[in-house]
Amino acid sequence: GVKKIHYVFEDSYQLLNFLKKDKRIKHIHHLTGTVTNEVLKGINKKKGIKYNKKKVYIVRFKKELTPRLRKLVTNQEVKIMIHYSLIVAYEFFNRLRKGEKSFFKTNITHLCMSDRISRGLKKIGVVEKKLKISKKPNHKSMMLLLKHIK
């Protein structure tokens, strides 16, 4: 396990900015899951910083939507979606049918954990006015945003 945590960052960009300012950091031990953080890939290329990545959990995507979720989607009963991960959002959209994709891009309010997730959803066609971004990339901030939307 981890015995001594020196710094905690709210997002990858905050970590990268810190590394630019503080040249004393020589070693980073990154605990992660199956999905690779694209932003942190750049740390591997920085000279003088030893970067260890350890997978501590695995994400397995379902091949199909559950029958209950499929029914909600088909009946257009979904009003709000919460996105904690861009990869998971992409995987979800890939499992939708054409008409369902159109509905989700224009009629659903999407709550995004970060600006990066919001930009990714814009790229796949989600209408900008339907995107809401959490002030901070954490669960508490997401729940405050959800409470404000309702």
How does the language model describe each region?
Residues G1-K150:
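Conserved beta-alpha
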